[in-house]
UniProtKB/Swiss-Prot annotation:
NCBIfam families: PRK05380.1, PyrG. It comes from the Bacteria. One of its GO terms (molecular function) is metal ion binding. CTP binds at residues 13, 148-150, 188-193, 224. It comes from Syntrophomonas wolfei subsp. wolfei (strain DSM 2245B / Goettingen). Pathway: Pyrimidine metabolism; CTP biosynthesis via de novo pathway; CTP from UDP: step 2/2. It is an enzyme of class 6 (ligase). Residues 1-267 are annotated as: Amidoligase domain. This is CTP synthase. ATP binds at residues 14-19, 71. One of its GO terms (cellular component) is cytosol.
Length: 542
């Protein structure tokens, strides 16, 4: 029968519950167990799809088209499996479902309340994965911090699940902070004691404490935490700050967290196989080269807005023993100061996805700089659309070419709304979302790095390249190297006579894994390494 692990957080937010959950998933999978992960977010939005990146960070898209929390990206990357829409659920989704049931009369005249109706719906969401995929372990992360009003229904639901499922099938892990007081030179346990007290007042006694800390915990301190938080000494696990998130599974393994879970849940499993992960973690410290990638975006002051892109660049860098330095560049700053001023010292350029007109001309100027100076370039989603606009304006001499998103009256709408998107009223979950097949054209750069004739990639967009201008742009040197099976949607473009100028309509960052970097990121990093090794600036400018 499926066993359940619930991860809560205490003292402060942003402790790394998601990384802890993902790392635990990796450890248990390494022992031959089938693992599923999910995240519950206590906000009232139905999903993060319409939220500002400044509020939420990136929106991570699953293979089946769900717009989810960025922690789902960590889950997929660490356990190296595709998750589904079951991996993320919000308060808004729960309430929407309950209200829909009430309107249909499913509750047969009952007064609909937080308990039992909301909590029952949460419990159904937790156990739904068991019915769909029959995993050995479901790891559920509860967003927010213990003590938040918003999290109370979720905490009550997971409290009830121990009663419903049985004590031998449920385990609670509390991730907490042990702050170091510089003036006193001491680590303090009192915040954790109060956090556990708050959790116990709700009816949940944590089985294991994962203690985030800047300093090593002494045996005396661990014993104190065990005594006052009423957990076994072996269940006090320290998790110091790590140089790389990919070290965290090994740090938890050294603390024997997986063994403690196996013992408590009575799991039967094989010896841990972490050979591949150990090699990955050691590679992080053997990087003997360095390149700089200029990332030109709208939300660069919040790197979490581009989290999967950052991790994908790192994955490719690991394969080439290369450290990736990212130069974060405001697209609007490019408009004011010029592309050459800001990009002259980078080894490669990436324009990520985004929405809205702000900074667009800066991104278009960036694409022009990469094309004219033969700088390795990767455009993603809106990044590809900007590259197309630039090519149409400056190579095809289509004066005023633009996307109908930014200029509905453009004489050359080289990017336009996809069919069926014209009169969409509700913005949530209405884009082209999730995995779609893409056919690759032999003899192209894209085909060379993929090494296959067809692949599947994840999308999140409303606009597409306008096929009306396709032939004219191809006649001027645009290469269409990836296309939908019906031949209608341009998925990947590149340029003739350029060593690496590739752009795609989809989001390759959602398919990259630390042990299997995405081919397009591999191509960008290889191109950047070659570019950096060119003998002089003149040759770079071609």
């Amino acid at each position: 029968m499926t066993k359940y692990i619930f991860i809560t957080g205490g003292v402060v937010s942003s402790l790394g519950k998601g990384i802890t959950a993902a790392s635990l998933g990796r450890l248990l999978k390494g022992r031959g167990l089938k693992v599923a992960l999910q995240k519950f977010d206590p906000y009232i939005n139905v999903d993060p799809g319409t939220m500002s990146p400044y509020q939420h960070g990136e929106v991570y898209v699953t293979e089946d088209g769900a717009e989810t929390d960025l922690d789902v990206g960590h889950y997929e990357r660490f356990i190296d499996e595709n998750l589904s829409h079951y991996a993320n659920c919000t308060t808004g989704r729960i309430y929407q479902t309950v209200l829909d049931k009430e309107r249909r009369g499913d509750y047969l005249g009952q007064t609909v309340q937080v308990i039992p109706h909301i909590t029952n719906e949460i419990k159904d969401r937790v156990t739904m994965i068991e019915k769909e995929n029959s995993p050995d372990i479901v790891i559920s992360e509860i967003g927010g911090t213990v003590g938040d009003i918003e999290s109370l229904p979720f905490l009550e639901a997971i409290r009830q699940l121990k009663f419903d499922l049985g004590k031998d099938r449920v385990l609670y892990i509390h991730v907490t902070l042990i702050p170091y007081i510089e003036a006193a030179g001491e680590l303090k346990t009192k915040p954790t004691q109060h956090s556990v007290k708050e959790l116990r007042s709700i009816g949940i006694q944590p089985d294991i404490l994962v203690c985030r800390t800047q300093k090593e915990l002494s045996e005396d301190l661990k014993a104190k935490l065990a005594l006052f938080c009423d957990v076994d000494r072996e269940a006090v696990v320290q998790l110091p700050d790590a140089e790389s998130i990919y070290e965290v599974p090994l740090m938890l393994a050294r603390e024997k967290l997986d063994l403690e879970i196996i013992r408590r849940l009575g799991l039967e499993c094989k010896q841990a196989d972490l050979k591949e992960w150990k090699e990955l973690a050691s590679r992080v410290h053997r990087l003997d080269k360095e390149i700089c990638i200029g990332l030109v975006g709208k939300y660069v002051e919040l790197p979490d807005a581009y989290l999967s892109i950052v991790e994908s660049l790192k994955h490719a860098g690991f394969q080439y023993n290369c450290e990736i330095k990212i130069k974060w560049i405001y697209a609007e700053k490019v408009e004011k100061e010029g592309a050459e001023e800001l990009l002259q010292n980078v080894d490669g350029i990436l324009i990520p996805g985004g929405f809205g007109e702000r900074g667009i001309e800066g991104k278009i100027a960036t694409a022009a700089y990469a094309r004219e100076n033969r700088v390795p370039f990767l455009g993603i989603c809106l990044g590809m659309q900007c590259a197309i606009i630039e090519f149409a304006r400056n190579v095809c001499q289509m004066k005023g070419a633009n996307s109908s998103e930014f200029d509905p009256d453009s004489p050359y709408p080289v990017v336009h709304l996809m069919p069926g998107q014209e009169n969409v009223a509700n913005k949530g979950a209405s884009m082209r979302l999730g995995g779609y097949p893409c056919r690759l054209v032999e003899g192209t750069l894209a085909y060379g790095v993929y090494g296959v004739s067809e692949t599947s990639e994840r999308h999140r967009h409303r606009y597409e390249i306008n096929n009306e201008y396709r032939k004219e742009m191809e006649s001027k040197g645009l290469v269409i190297s990836g296309i939908s099976p019906d031949g209608q949607l341009i998925e990947i473009i590149e340029l003739k006579e350029h060593p690496w100028f590739v752009a795609c309509q989809f989001h390759p960052e959602f398919k990259s894994r630390p042990n299997r970097p995405h081919p397009l990121f591999m191509g960008l990093i290889k191109g950047a390494l070659d570019y950096k090794e060119e003998p002089d600036t003149a040759s770079r400018e071609g």
